[in-house]
Design a protein with these regions (language model features):
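Glycine-rich, often acidic, oxyanion-interacting loops/wings at catalytic, nucleic-acid
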Residues: 139-228
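Nucleic-acid-processing active sites and adjacent nucleic-acid-binding tracks
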Residues: 29, 33-62
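Low-complexity, acidic/Ser/Thr- and charged residue-rich accessory regions of DNA metabolism proteins
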Residues: 274, 311-431
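Short glycine-rich phosphate-binding loop at a beta-alpha junction
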Residues: 61-69
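Phosphate-backbone recognition surface of nucleic-acid-processing proteins
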Residues: 228-231, 237, 242-322, 404, ...
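Short alpha-helix plus adjacent loop in nuclease-associated cores
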Residues: 87-125, 132, 178, 182, ...
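Gly/Thr-rich phosphate-binding beta-strand-loop-beta motif of the actin/hexokinase/Hsp70
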Residues: 6-30, 112
Length: 431
């Protein structure tokens, strides 16, 4: 107890940082537990001069506090490289701490240190370098998808404005029909030029989207966690990739409810006294991930036969609103994903057939050259080698000795002790 009291009484240096794209404002303050930090000095510098400023003016052993923003993670990584500890606080940590007539970067930097000292700041997880790359690829894919949709809407709008036959769908096959209609339509030279440029923009956007999608598929073909999530009906390459990219380490979430809240699929609570309030879905969470899981829930509702799918259809038959049922099914799928990533046994193996089909499709997408580079003869060998890690029956009946040998070479011998259904951890020899 005395040691704990001494540790609390020790003085610590806090550095509040208000970061912008080019400018940095630092507040170096002394802090003792149980009191507000006392400002020692304020430093104005630039992002390029971060390392030199810290080495000259910030003492070693200090703790830097940064509000979450676009370039926060890169700043934290640079500070850690030169031996400084840094933490990222939630973006709304300064809400209500400053008067409207006293707001500037210096005051915000000082308030960041005060918020942390008072326990008001919620720490934000800083992803590792590999998972930051995953997020960059994912955001690039989302941006390319949005650009492709906008470009297709321009093509559709051009056809509608000039009385041409409206294209159906958004696939490249429809582009050929539009190009044919463009040649046959009675248009001026300028109008044909505008229409052809809209088509070129759409082709370019679809090509960019395809490149990002291939990068995602190549990553999934080499990542065991992403492959394990594909066992869940409705989770294919994009959803599995996105979930692992944001979750990173599943041990950050002690129970599945924490992961559900992280995604943003939990109901909000707003009750006081006799007024219970509403229980609509919270607006917090990760919007992209929430949308992907919700779409996956709609797909699994149409095709799934597992208990959670039968539960959802039963609720619809009872008259429950469709959106609420989809939200509930999406929550169940996230809970399922938590157990899969934790390596817990699954209650059934009904999804083994769809899992194998997804793996074969993944093998088709990455191509024969990539399959040979990974040591597989064809897509069936690729699918069977991965399935044997999760379904022991598959390894005993459908996977040849050569395939298991290739899997051992690629996974470090994991095929010798199959993981079991839906990521069941291998049993210890003593048990």
């Amino acid at each position: 107890m005395r040691r704990k009291m001494q540790a609390r009484d020790e003085e610590k240096i806090l550095v509040g940082m208000d970061a912008h794209s080019e400018k940095l404002e630092l507040c170096v303050a002394r802090w003792t537990h149980g009191s507000d930090p006392v400002r020692c000095k304020s430093i104005t510098t630039t992002v390029d001069a971060l390392e030199s400023t810290y080495s000259k003016q910030v003492p070693q052993g200090s703790l830097t506090l940064i509000e979450a923003s676009q370039n926060t993670f890169s700043i934290v990584e640079r500070l850690r490289r030169i031996g400084y500890e840094a933490k990222v606080l939630n973006s709304d940590v300064l809400k209500g701490m400053a008067r409207r007539d006293r707001i500037n970067d210096r005051i915000d930097a000082e308030n960041l240190a005060k918020a942390y000292a008072r326990g008001n700041g919620r720490e934000v997880h800083v992803p590792g370098e590999e998972h930051r790359e995953y997020r960059d690829v994912l955001f690039g894919y989302f941006a390319a998808t949005k650009d492709a949709l906008r470009a297709w809407n321009r093509v559709w709008g051009f056809c509608s404005a000039h009385g041409m036959k409206l294209p159906k769908g958004g696939r490249l096959n429809s582009v050929k029909d539009v190009e044919t209609a463009l040649e046959e339509a009675h248009l001026t030279k300028t109008q044909r030029f505008v229409g052809s440029m809209d088509i070129e923009q759409y082709k370019s956007a679809m090509d960019l989207k395809g490149r990002f999608q291939r990068q995602i598929e190549l990553t999934v073909s080499k990542n065991k966690d992403m492959q394990a999530l594909m066992q869940i009906l409705g989770f294919r390459f994009i959803v599995s990739f996105a979930l692992v990219a944001f979750v990173e380490d599943i041990r950050r979430f002690p129970n599945p409810g924490k992961l559900v809240a992280y995604v943003g699929l939990n109901p909000r609570m707003n009750s006081s006294g006799k007024d219970e309030g509403g229980n609509a879905m919270t607006s917090y969470g990760i919007p992209h991930l929430k949308a992907l899981v919700t779409e996956a829930a709609q797909i699994s509702l149409r095709h799934g036969e597992a208990p959670m799918h039968r539960w959802a259809r039963r609720k619809l038959a009872e008259g429950k609103p469709y959106n609420k049922v989809i939200g509930g099914l999406a929550r169940k799928m996230v809970v399922y994903a938590w157990h899969v990533l934790m390596g817990h046994p699954a209650p059934n193996c009904e999804m083994e057939a769809s899992f194998t089909r997804k793996l074969e499709l993944l093998g088709t997408r990455i191509g024969k050259d990539e399959l040979k580079a990974q040591g597989f003869a064809d897509k069936r060998a690729f699918a069977a080698s991965i399935a044997c890690l999760f379904y022991p029956k598959t390894s005993a009946s459908t996977v040849s000795h050569d395939v298991c040998a290739a899997t051992q070479a690629n996974t470090g011998g994991l095929c010798e002790r199959p993981a079991g259904r839906l990521g069941t951890p291998p049993r210890d020899k003593k048990s």
